[in-house]
Amino acid sequence: MRVIDFYDRHPISEQHVLDAVRRARSVGPLAAEDLFAFDQDHYGGLAAVDVLARRAGITASSRVLDICAGLGGPARFLASRRRCRVVGVELNAGRAAGMARLTRLVRLEDRVAVVRGDAVTLPFATGLFDACVSQEALLHIADKAAVLAEARRVLAPGGRLAFTDWIAHASLGDGERRRLNAWMAAVTVQTLHGYRALLGRAGFKAVEAEDLSDEWRPIIRERLRMYRGMRAELTVRFGERGYRDYDQLYAFFVALVEDGKLGGGRFSGSA
């Protein structure tokens, strides 16, 4: 499966966020905080974004790049809470447009921008940003070395990269890797030590690599329960068969995490 197709059919969509917000708030203008319970399409919610912000050294004066920004939930959170300026780069046209619309909805377009582009050829000048962040996205990119080299290029001297991603443990088999690629465009799943080496080769210093697998296990269980609670909504969008296929495949994904074959990692380094 192509990554664009995977996110076109992802349960958490712009419309899902808007519907959830309308159920929670019936009147009045919206602020960024009104979206936070619904627009954080990553593991660990706002706390996870806060940790990345600390690892990346983000302050109010920071120029931040969110690589593979999706619907822009973390970018809006950073701009709202840290008062920094954030640019999100996103390959999927629908999600890039959704990020722009949601950002305008909460009147943060003066601090958050989105550019449609490819993470392996970032459309930005060298040294433009003070910090780069990304969350659970690089598994979709075959040439991880190119992404990390581009992140290093667009960072100013002393700037920092911090990101999370899925990692493979030794017991993850070739057949399971192929199924992950076919279902969710996980073209390559790197190991913890593999990422550490790639960061070093890209020129990053003071590299840190943390295994989050135990922390993510209960989160991924809850995500499966959440998707199953969205059955009516997802059946309308994708049909009964489409819903059943997604449920079966997500259950397979959760089983890999439960069995210790797949996990999460957090990485950081200085330019």
Predicted regions and their residues:
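A short acidic, Gly/Pro-enriched loop at the edge of an enzyme's catalytic core
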Residues: 120-131
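N-terminal, positively charged/glycine-rich alpha-helical extensions of SAM-dependent methyltransferases
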Residues: 1-32
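Conserved Class I S-adenosyl-L-methionine
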Residues: 208-271
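Conserved alpha-helix/loop element of class I SAM-dependent methyltransferases that forms part
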Residues: 27, 42-60
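Short, glycine-/aromatic-enriched active-site segment of Class I SAM-dependent methyltransferases
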Residues: 166-186
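Short alpha-helix
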Residues: 187-203, 209
